[in-house]
Design a protein with these regions (language model features):
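Outer membrane beta-barrel
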Residues: 22-35, 42-164
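Long, low-complexity, polar and repeat-rich extracellular regions
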Residues: 1-2
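Sec-dependent N-terminal signal peptides
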Residues: 5-13
Length: 164
């Protein structure tokens, strides 16, 4: 009887640590319009290059750590078709899982490479021109599959990025 009460007391001590806060978000972008051309109305294509549907989530693991994921899918607004460059599969943009904490973030999957992740902060109009000009015209591979990516915590307002 004493052993079972002791076991119950030990298990109840860990019961509170098992609870965590999680969130899942559905977001995206739709860029479409109507065009009147030669007296007829037609559905307009995307001016920004793509429409996207994104699923992302974060789970608080406690102790300042969290797990997260992102699935980003491109589609054609006119017919719902898969709209991926080069015939890539579904979810061809950012698709990764990761672990974050006081050490920074570690991600595994398909994602922007470090140069492109950094450039994105300067590309206010999603054209690529500002980022390309800012880096002296150097355009690395935008996304890479089977990537291990590390982003450091803020180091006096700066971050270190590395990906292989």
């Amino acid at each position: 009887m004493k052993k079972s009460l002791l076991a119950l007391a030990v298990l109840s001590a860990f019961a509170g640590a098992a609870s965590a806060q999680s969130s899942v978000t559905l977001s995206g972008r739709v860029d479409a319009g109507l065009i009147r051309q030669n007296g007829a109305w037609n559905m307009g294509g995307s001016q920004s290059g793509y429409n996207a549907l994104t699923f992302s989530g974060r789970e608080d693991l406690g102790g300042g750590m969290n797990a997260f994921f992102t699935l980003n899918h491109r589609f054609g607004i006119n017919d719902g078709s898969i709209n991926n460059p080069g015939g890539a599969s579904n979810f061809c943009r950012n698709v990764f899982v990761g672990l974050g904490g006081g050490f920074g973030d570690v991600r595994l999957g398909r994602m922007l490479m470090p140069l492109q992740e950094w450039n994105g902060a300067f590309d206010a109009f999603d054209t690529g021109y500002v980022a390309s000009t800012h880096t002296g015209g150097i355009m690395a591979t935008v996304r890479s599959t089977n990537t291990i990516y590390y982003r450091s915590p803020s180091l006096g307002g700066f971050f270190a990025h590395a990906g292989i």
